[in-house]
Structures are given as C-alpha cells and as structure tokens.
C-alpha cells in the first residue's frame, strides 16, 4: 500500500470512530441515565447556592 492509500484508510478509521462515538438524539437505552441524574443533582445544589463541584464552586459556597 502506498502512503496516500494508508493515509486515506487512517482518515476513514478516524471518521468512522468519531461518527460512532458521537452522541445521538435518539431514545436512551439507559446507559447514560446516571449521568443525567448527576446533572440534575448539581442543578439542585446550585438552586440552594451550594456547590462543591469545581465547575460551579467558584460562584457558590461548598456548604460543607
């Protein structure tokens, strides 16, 4: 195989991997329900003005 063909195969593999790992908007099969629950928990803490997560901790107290 030539270098150009190997590079083309590499790009196709990268593209296929990206498309497969890209999250879809279809109905969930339950694999990411925990992640959704954790996000809602963080929203509840932000409503209380308490957040120990570094993403929101600089704006709110930790509450510990």
Swiss-Prot record:
Residue numbers for the site described as Key residue that binds to three hydrophobic amino acids of the delta subunit of muscle-type acetylcholine receptor?
A: 60
Alphabetical keyword list: Acetylcholine receptor inhibiting toxin, Amidation, Cleavage on pair of basic residues, Disulfide bond, Ion channel impairing toxin, Neurotoxin, Postsynaptic neurotoxin, Secreted, Signal, Toxin
In the record's own words, the domains note is: The cysteine framework is I (CC-C-C). Alpha3/5 pattern.
Q: Which InterPro entries match?
A: Conotoxin_a-typ (IPR009958), Conotoxin_a-typ_CS (IPR018072)
Q: Per its record, what are the GO molecular function terms?
A: acetylcholine receptor inhibitor activity; ion channel regulator activity; toxin activity
Native organism = Conus geographus (Geography cone)
Tissue note: Expressed by the venom duct.
Between which residues do disulfide bridges form? 51-56, 52-62
Family under the similarity heading? Belongs to the conotoxin A superfamily.
Functionally, this protein is described as follows:
Alpha-conotoxins act on postsynaptic membranes, they bind to the nicotinic acetylcholine receptors (nAChR) and thus inhibit them. Reversibly inhibits mammalian muscle nAChR (IC(50)=339 nM on adult subtype (alpha-1-beta-1-gamma-delta/CHRNA1-CHRNB1-CHRNG-CHRND) and IC(50)=5.86-995 nM on fetal subtype (alpha-1-beta-1-delta-epsilon/CHRNA1-CHRNB1-CHRND-CHRNE)). The higher affinity site is the alpha/delta site on mouse muscle-derived BC3H-1 receptor, and the other site (alpha/gamma site) on nicotinic receptors from Torpedo californica electric organ.
Q: Where found in the cell?
A: Secreted
Establish whether keyword Transferase is in the entry.
Answer: no
Which protein is depicted?
Answer: Alpha-conotoxin GI
Chief location of this protein within or outside the cell: secreted
| Misc remark | Negative results: Shows no or weak inhibition on neuronal nAChR alpha-3-beta-2/CHRNA3-CHRNB2, alpha-3-beta-4/CHRNA3-CHRNB4, alpha-4-beta-2/CHRNA4-CHRNB2, alpha-4-beta-4/CHRNA4-CHRNB4, alpha-7/CHRNA7, alpha-9-alpha-10/CHRNA9-CHRNA10.
Query: Domain of life here?
Result: Eukaryota
């Amino acid at each position: 195989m030539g270098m150009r063909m190997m590079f083309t195969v590499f790009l196709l593999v990268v593209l296929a991997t990206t498309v497969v790992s890209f999250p879809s908007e279809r109905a969930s099969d339950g694999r990411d329900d925990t992640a959704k629950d954790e996000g809602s928990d963080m929203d509840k803490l932000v409503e209380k003005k308490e957040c120990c997560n570094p993403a929101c901790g600089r704006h709110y107290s930790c509450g510990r």
